[in-house]
Amino acid sequence: MSWQAYVDEHLMCEIEGHHLTSAAIVGHDGAVWAQSTAFPQFKTEEMTNIMKDFDEPGFLAPTGLFLGPTKYMVIQGEPGAVIRGKKGSGGITVKKTGQALVIGIYDEPMTPGQCNMVVERLGDYLLEQGL
């Protein structure tokens, strides 16, 4: 299965009638492996900061998580494994695997829990596959 198929079929899939706004799988180096059409253009520095938060949990808390034009307030995640962010009625979930970051961005009517489930399910699967 191609990386694009993972994004299209596993991240952008329908959950209780709702979809993520956008999603991507990005290497630890910031290289995009696959993304949905609406996934924001981001700076390499933004991915570097996300990776730093996985290594040093709490690193992003004072400044927020920036991805493209959006700043998310970092909320409770799982140190070293999952970063969650909130902005208005939407937010972001980032799951770290051995080689990649699985990223999902949502807005109402999708809930934070639905976004977490979709992103973390694929992230856990990739971890099981040694990726």
Swiss-Prot record:
Identify the domain of life. Answer: Eukaryota
Q: Where in the cell is it found?
A: Cytoplasm, Cytoskeleton
User: Which cysteine pairs are joined by S-S bonds?
Assistant: C13-C115
Decide whether keyword Membrane is in the record.
no
Give start-end ranges for motif Involved in PIP2 interaction.
81-97
Report the residues modified as Phosphothreonine: T111
The record's section on InterPro entries has: PFN, PFN_euk, PFN_sf, Profilin_CS
User: Pfam families, per this entry?
Assistant: Profilin
Query: Keyword Secreted, does the record have it?
Result: no
Q: Name one GO cellular component term.
A: cytoskeleton
Q: Which UniProt keywords apply?
A: Actin-binding, Allergen, Cytoplasm, Cytoskeleton, Disulfide bond, Phosphoprotein
GO MF, one example: actin monomer binding
Q: Which family does it belong to?
A: Belongs to the profilin family.
Additional remark text = The variability of the residues taking part of IgE-binding epitopes might be responsible of the difference in cross-reactivity among olive pollen cultivars, and between distantly related pollen species, leading to a variable range of allergy reactions among atopic patients.
**Annotated function:** Binds to actin and affects the structure of the cytoskeleton. At high concentrations, profilin prevents the polymerization of actin, whereas it enhances it at low concentrations.
Q: How does it assemble?
A: Occurs in many kinds of cells as a complex with monomeric actin in a 1:1 ratio.
Protein name in UniProt? Profilin-10
From which organism does this entry originate? Zea mays
